Design a protein with these regions (language model features):
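Intrinsic-disorder-preferring feature that marks N-terminal prepro/targeting segments
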Residues: 1-178, 196
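Folded, disulfide-stabilized extracellular/luminal domains of secretory-pathway proteins
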Residues: 123, 127-128, 132-305
Length: 305
């Protein structure tokens, strides 16, 4: 499906971009709202160019083409037999007590960051994001309603509309400004922001060893923003008071180094009882904290208080 979507999206461009050496509006917004918070490399990859002008009248195009395909999972969904079989050779989920130096985990860190950029704030605000507006959304994106691309868009919109299983506040953000505003509203202005950084991408599953220096870096409140599959960068951000975030240094069997971010969910009682995590770890909902690494294109905001 990815290749067919790529052919479609390669012809689309949301903005006529004029290269400039200045800071983009999104970057300036970050610096004004979070002046003492370094911007993670993963967010920098999504920043639009410094100068741009919208083209195409009422038609909305893509930021820079390409299919945005991220490795993610949903707490709301049951894991299929196919997913379980495909995940059997990697430690996608693990326990919090394993976060100690010397622990070995089989992990795949694949670079899922796309060349597509965040929408400008005004464009993101103007884009509808509800199932009832699906025909309008597909029309603005020039997507055939019968295509595979339409199914991707429809599924993500549905995910954005479906209430959180735990009642946590959620927002689907298509601009950096939306992501920052949501995080500030939920956490206050004393914030740390981190994402996984991989020194050398090895797309194969390999064994990584946890090194000295594991640290819990956020307070009791976090906002996690997970990249979704969509026609342009879209992040599902959710506020949580039951997630512990860790910075975990790793070294792979091939010598590659990773500064990984780990999220440990302490309350899984309301997750789908057939969720892939429960099947892989052979535990029941709510019985124990469940942890996972964050892909490179996922971000965690944490209160530093």
């Amino acid at each position: 499906m990815a290749s067919s979507l790529g052919v479609l999206f390669a012809f689309l461009s949301v903005l006529h971009v004029v290269v400039s050496h200045g800071a983009s509006p999104a970057q300036m917004y970050w610096e004004s709202k979070l002046p003492n918070t370094p911007m993670p490399k993963s967010i920098q990859e999504f920043l639009p160019e410094a100068d741009y002008s919208a083209q195409g009248g009422s038609k909305l195009f893509l930021a820079s083409g390409g299919v945005l395909k991220s490795k993610t999972f949903s707490y709301k969904h049951a894991g299929t037999e196919e997913e379980l079989a495909a995940s059997s050779n990697a430690d996608i989920f693990f326990f919090e007590h394993q976060l100690i130096p010397g622990t070995k985990l089989k992990v795949q860190f694949s670079n899922t960051i796309s060349k597509a950029k965040f929408l400008p704030a005004n464009v993101a605000k103007s884009m509808p994001m509800s199932s009832k507006d699906l025909p309008q959304i597909l029309a603005r994106l020039a997507i055939n309603p019968a295509s595979a691309a339409s199914k991707v868009v429809s599924q993500t919109i549905n995910d954005c509309e479906t209430p959180s299983v735990s009642g946590e506040p959620e927002l689907c953000a298509a601009s950096l400004e939306q992501m920052v505003d949501f995080s500030l509203k939920k956490l206050g202005n004393q914030i740390q922001v981190k994402s996984t950084e991989v020194e050398k991408v090895d797309r194969a599953v390999q064994e990584y060893t946890i090194q000295e220096g594991v640290e819990r870096f956020a307070g009791s409140k976090t906002v996690a923003c997970h990249a979704k599959n969509f026609a342009y960068p879209m992040f599902m951000c959710h506020a949580a008071a039951t997630t512990r975030a860790y910075s975990v240094p790793l070294v792979g069997a091939n010598g590659s180094k990773v500064n990984a971010v780990v999220a440990c969910h302490t309350n899984t009682a309301r997750w789908n009882p057939r969720n892939l995590a429960f099947q892989m770890l052979k535990v029941s909902p709510g019985s124990t904290p469940i942890c996972h690494f964050l892909p490179e294109d996922h971000i965690i905001f944490g209160s530093s208080n």
